[in-house]
Regions:
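ADP-ribose/adenylate-binding Rossmann-like module
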Residues: 286, 302-320, 334
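Glycine-rich beta-strand-centered segment in the early N-terminal region that forms part
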Residues: 40-57, 72-127, 174-176
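Adenosine-nucleotide cofactor-binding segment
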Residues: 205-211, 223-295
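C-terminal hydrophobic helical "lid"/dimerization subdomain
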Residues: 17, 275, 298-301, 350-405
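Glycine-rich Rossmann-fold phosphate-binding loop(s) that bind the pyrophosphate
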Residues: 210-214, 315
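C-terminal substrate-binding/catalytic core of Rossmann-like NAD(P)-dependent dehydrogenases/reductases
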Residues: 267-277, 281, 320-371, 379-380
Length: 405
């Protein structure tokens, strides 16, 4: 039984950094840190842990960044290679344990917080339900790892075998929610958290920069869970533009027209400095940056009105130069929106995952899944994920059910 295992080394890291974008298939070739191999089943760290057989596993932008070494070395002390990759997972429980029955379908909440690690009392963040912000991600019953799929002890979703999960990580899936819809719940939960954390009002103009799956899901969450008024989405490809409108955006702008069209749409103007990008005097009240590149982060700051808020939803890459003058001059508030947790929604405290499940039927997540690949086709799968926007895909997945489309 095969798994896709990430083996980190300094030479491989440097090779990927230098050549992954220039040399075709380097990140899945002979010298790649990702290798298809017969990895053993992970052991249960403690008796209450549960074994889960993945059905579908998504390919996330953070996975692609890991393979190409574009991710920041910030995460190096809080991950533990070699690890089986994959944190977007719908699967079935294999044995009766900890209140779960064999055959039950579950979606994984991959954060490895205090409860997962057997740490009691929990840190303040875990105690408040914000497990993704856990202070103890390098301590306890399992090796360092911010999430399943980045920890050597848990396994991950890119496997024909099983992964192991603490019962606190598992959410039962309603029967009427398909595997395809369920595998997208984890990124949708991230978008739910981002939308509610910034929570635009009806008088706000909200700008979403980026229309990959996290940008599209952010549009969906904003429209369904907040009172957001006008939503503008920056989307490059035809499928992305269509999906953004379907999910609730009012207007679409092509990235190449960012400074040509957006200032007028936002009721402001752009002025040309001697060097660099245009200076925008006004802007949107709330901006969600869903790409993670230095260029789009800078765009977000420049396109926010004075006193406005920018939510950094896309995972930033390795360090690069970034002009923060607009943040300083316009007194913009920049905050991160990482993963998920417990949300305050209409007077109730509930998890981001529960809210994601609540809106999933309206979003029609299953229509956004595909193509699907067997694990042995991982080279084609990674290539498809890399070109997803251009090829009209939203979420590329590994299908462990023996079905190929």
């Amino acid at each position: 039984m095969l798994s896709l295992v990430y083996h980190k080394s300094v030479p491989r890291y440097l090779l990927m950094r230098a050549g992954a974008k220039r040399i075709k298939n380097l990140e899945t070739g002979r010298f790649s840190p990702l290798q298809l191999e017969d990895a053993p089943e992970p052991e249960l760290p403690t008796p209450e842990w549960i074994r889960v057989k993945p059905l579908l596993s998504g390919i996330c932008g953070s996975d692609l960044g890991t393979l190409s070494s574009d991710n920041s070395p910030y995460f190096s002390p809080i991950t533990s290679p070699p690890f089986v990759m994959g944190h977007e997972v719908v699967g079935v429980v294999t044995d009766d344990n900890s209140g779960f029955r064999a055959g039950e379908r579950v979606v994984l909440e991959p954060a490895l917080g205090c409860a997962v690690r057997g740490i009691d009392p929990p840190c303040p963040y875990c105690a408040s339900g914000r497990h993704a912000l856990c202070l103890n991600v390098a301590k306890g019953d399992v090796s360092p790892g911010i999430q399943t799929g980045f920890c050597r002890d848990t396994g991950g979703g890119w496997t024909q075998r099983t992964l192991v999960a603490h019962p606190s990580q598992l959410h039962r899936v309603p029967e009427d929610l398909s595997d395809e819809a369920t595998v997208a719940l984890e990124p949708l939960a991230c978008a739910v958290h981002a939308a509610l954390k910034t929570n635009p009002g009806p008088d706000d103009t909200t700008l979403v920069i980026g229309a990959g799956n996290i940008g599209l899901f952010t549009v969906a969450a904003l429209r369904r869970l907040t009172d957001a008024g006008r939503i503008i989405c920056v989307a490059k490809h035809e499928r992305q533009r269509e999906e953004a409108l379907r999910l609730g955006a009012d207007e679409i702008v092509h990235p190449k027209r960012t400074y040509a069209d957006l200032p007028e749409m936002l009721g402001t103007e752009a002025m040309r400095p001697e060097l660099g990008k245009p200076v925008v005097t006004g802007g949107a009240e709330k901006v969600f940056e869903c790409v993670g590149s230095a260029g789009t982060i800078e765009d977000a700051l420049r396109l926010t009105k004075p006193g406005g808020k920018v939510s950094l939803v896309g995972m930033p890459g390795a360090k690069s130069s970034l002009d923060l003058t607009a943040l300083w001059h316009k007194e913009v508030t920049l905050s991160g929106a990482y993963a998920y947790g417990v949300e305050e929604y209409k007077g109730e405290r509930t998890s981001s995952f529960d809210l994601a499940m609540r809106i999933a039927p309206q979003v029609r997540l299953e229509t956004m899944i595909g193509p699907r690949f067997r694990l042995e086709e991982y080279r084609e799968a990674i290539a498809a994920a890399r070109s997803a926007g251009r090829e009209g895909h939203v979420k590329v997945v590994f299908d462990h059910r023996g079905i190929r489309h």
